[in-house]
């Protein structure tokens, strides 16, 4: 019984430490949402595969798209929870939280951007502005 109580208290303390982590980010952007995108491309210089997605799947006019386009993006909101990842894993495995960049809103190999049109289920995001992360 004592061991179970100790384990439970340790797990709660560990989870609390993650939520209080100094690296945690609650970045927001004016009129948009912070995203982690696998790539960010200029609307005037899109890859042919991205053009096909925009015109073929999404039925958008390329001439109407300006600025930066995020490709394959996931949302990063408070501590990253509720984004494109399945956040329920943290309830079952503390180590999963520590190993997951999205748990603290970090884009490890992706570009962090602020995008104003994210209504394409992560396929693309429009109106993106890169967010520079200083270390």
Curated annotation (Swiss-Prot):
Aerial growth, conidiation, and dispersal of filamentous fungi in the environment rely upon a capability of their secreting small amphipathic proteins called hydrophobins (HPBs) with low sequence identity. Class I can self-assemble into an outermost layer of rodlet bundles on aerial cell surfaces, conferring cellular hydrophobicity that supports fungal growth, development and dispersal; whereas Class II form highly ordered films at water-air interfaces through intermolecular interactions but contribute nothing to the rodlet structure. It comes from Coprinopsis cinerea (strain Okayama-7 / 130 / ATCC MYA-4618 / FGSC 9003). InterPro entries: Hydrophobin. The lineage of its organism: Eukaryota, Fungi, Dikarya, Basidiomycota, Agaricomycotina. GO terms for molecular function: structural constituent of cell wall. Its main location: secreted. Self-assembles to form functional amyloid fibrils called rodlets. Self-assembly into fibrillar rodlets occurs spontaneously at hydrophobic:hydrophilic interfaces and the rodlets further associate laterally to form amphipathic monolayers. Belongs to the fungal hydrophobin family. It is found in: Secreted; Secreted, Cell wall. Induction: Expression is light-dependent and positiveley regulated by the GATA transcription factor nsdD2 that binds promoter regulatory sequences containing a GATC motif. Glycans are attached at residues 117, 132. Keywords: Cell wall, Disulfide bond, Glycoprotein, Secreted, Signal. This is Class I hydrophobin 2.
């Amino acid at each position: 019984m004592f061991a179970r109580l100790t384990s439970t208290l340790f797990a709660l303390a560990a989870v609390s430490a993650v939520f209080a982590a100094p690296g945690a980010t609650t970045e927001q952007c004016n009129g948009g949402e912070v995203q982690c995108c696998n790539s960010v491309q200029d609307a005037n210089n899109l890859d042919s595969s991205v053009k096909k997605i925009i015109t073929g799947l999404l039925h958008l006019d390329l001439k109407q798209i300006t600025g930066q386009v995020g490709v394959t993006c996931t949302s990063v909101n408070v501590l990253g929870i509720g984004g494109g990842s399945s956040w329920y894993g943290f309830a079952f495995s503390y180590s999963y939280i520590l190993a997951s960049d999205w748990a603290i809103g970090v884009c490890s190999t992706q570009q962090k951007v602020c995008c104003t049109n994210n209504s394409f289920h992560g396929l693309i995001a429009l109106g993106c502005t890169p967010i520079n992360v200083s270390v």
